[in-house]
Regions:
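Short, low-complexity, Pro/Ser/Thr/Gly-rich segments in the mature regions of secreted, periplasmic
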Residues: 213-233
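Acidic helix-start/capping segments at beta-turn-to-alpha-helix junctions
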Residues: 70-75, 105-121
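Surface-exposed patches in mature extracellular/periplasmic domains of secreted proteins
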Residues: 97-110, 174-181, 232-233
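The catalytic-center signature of Zn2+-dependent metalloproteases
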Residues: 155-156, 161-217
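Second-shell loop/turn segments in exported
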Residues: 72-83, 146-153, 157, 206-211
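Disordered inhibitory propeptide/activation segment of secreted metzincin zinc metalloprotease zymogens
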Residues: 2-82, 188-193
Length: 233
């Protein structure tokens, strides 16, 4: 017997309004288990939407700086698929440009990378947004997007994909996002960056792109949000 549908039309509409106020496009928003999926690859936990006002959510939206974040690939993903190598290279990008410290650890990581058949999803992967200063806990690789995503994507393409999804785990939105939400609490432009950047790794619909480095403005954004601590005497 199927589990009864728990969300009323009113609750769903309220969730859409809250998510829109965060600056996210809800045009094709869908429900998946305990999550809402927006902009194809962003996972938002239902409980965090239902229990947190938009202003509170915005205030705790990005992860706190100077914390150690563990990332690991689920042990159900074969070693031969080089997702682990791609993950290690992806976290090196954030270690290079931010005050955050990423460590690869497959034992109970804060961010777990797994695979699932995300039917009807038009994205290579999906990353969960953060809450209360902590990173989103999931990156789900869409095993049904290509016939065999493990062999279809090169190591460089996997690295690009994971750098992008880790950005969502930290609270980064799509660089080419579709505008600001209600009351000025939505899509916030990072100081020193333009309104568009064709080279940004946080542009949407970039699955299949190869890694060519962070753009100049990607680096500005990372250093602005999570600056490294510089000690001078």
């Amino acid at each position: 017997m199927e589990e009864p549908f728990k969300d009323s039309a009113l609750e769903l509409e309220q969730a859409k309004l809250a998510i829109y106020a965060m600056g996210l496009d809800t045009t094709f928003m869908v429900e998946w288990n305990n999550y809402y999926i927006v902009e194809e690859d962003i996972l938002l936990c239902k409980d965090s939407i239902n229990l947190t006002s938009t202003r509170q959510y915005h205030a705790t939206y990005y992860v706190d700086n100077y914390q150690t974040i563990t990332v690991g690939v689920d042990n159900t993903i074969a070693q031969s698929t080089n997702w682990r190598e791609a993950t290690k290279e992806a976290i090196d990008v954030y270690n290079k440009y931010t005050g955050l410290r990423f460590v690869y650890n497959e034992y109970n990581p804060q961010i777990k990378i797994s695979k699932s058949n995300l039917y009807n999803a038009i994205a290579c992967a999906q990353g969960e947004f953060p809450l209360s200063g902590k990173p989103g806990s999931k990156i789900i690789i869409n095993d049904s997007f290509y016939k065999n995503i493990d062999t279809f994507l090169s190591l460089s393409q996997k690295k690009f994909l994971l750098v992008h999804e880790l950005g969502h785990n930290l609270g980064l939105r799509h660089t080419n996002g579709l505008g600001e939400g209600d009351g000025g609490v939505g899509l916030v432009q990072i100081p020193g960056t333009p309104t568009s950047d064709s080279q940004s790794f946080m542009n949407s619909t970039t699955c299949g792109n190869s890694w060519n480095g962070a753009s100049t403005y990607d680096v500005v954004a990372l250093k602005t949000l999570w600056p490294k601590c510089i000690i001078s005497f």
